[in-house]
Amino acid sequence: MSASDRNLMIAGGVFHPPEACVPSVTALLQEQGIETDVEEDVEAACQRLAQGGYRLLTISALRWRMDDPKYEAHRQRWALALSESARQAITGHLRAGGALLALHTASLCFDDWPQWSEILGGRWVWGQSGHAPFDQVEVRFDPAAPHRLTEGLTDFSCPDEVYERLWLAPDVQPLAHARNMRAKEGQPGDWAPVLWTRQWEGARVVYDALGHDAQSLDHPVHRQLIERAAAWALGRG
């Protein structure tokens, strides 16, 4: 197996156990010839990343400083301030030609590292961003933003969370929007951007804000979207 076929996936975190998403993501990537190693320990994962051998880094984790008092009960187990060596491992991976596939909670991660939102092209803003309860969501692809990721895909609906009011970098062009279909007293919520691509210092980056669990990740259209996202990030075909 060549390095181009290998993926390192960082998963897990409070309220988002890895078993909710890891099997779905690793299975669909394996079908594309991409073998995945999974780590829940972020620092250990970044040590592995720094050693090389991975072309794709997938973040499907929920790890941040947890400064808000309401997270006090979870802080000892789950709070994370990313070390300088871990930051260098991620940027080193990208500068060496590696790719990044960021899923769902990745926009909440590493809130003590400003460069992360620059790499990702967006971030969760505490006190501003939010989401309605997990429910049926409607996803629409933007015909005004054609891209290999979305070409020929049909709009779809599935159970998920829609992250609203994220900060987006000025140059980000969303490829899809979604809304919770019962967010406002049974009425649909606001449309929010949920998918975009980006290049950071030559590295290809994809962020897919959907994917709370297998009910979303196993939807046929969403599966195809993630397959294409990985292929595009790796520069395949």
Give residue spans per PLM region.
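Aromatic-Pro/Gly-enriched surface loop or interdomain linker
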Residues: 1-55
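A glycine-centered loop/beta-turn motif at secondary-structure junctions
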Residues: 5-7, 31, 57, 167-237
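Short beta-strand/turn micro-motifs composed of small residues
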Residues: 11, 104, 178
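Solvent-exposed loop/turn segments at secondary-structure junctions
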Residues: 14-15, 43-44, 63-66, 106-110, ...
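Catalytic beta-strand/loop cores that center a nucleophilic Ser/Cys/Thr
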Residues: 29, 118, 122-201
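Short, structured active-site "lid" loops
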Residues: 52-70
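A glycine-rich, often tryptophan-bearing local segment used as a flexible ligand/cofactor-contacting loop or short
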Residues: 64-152
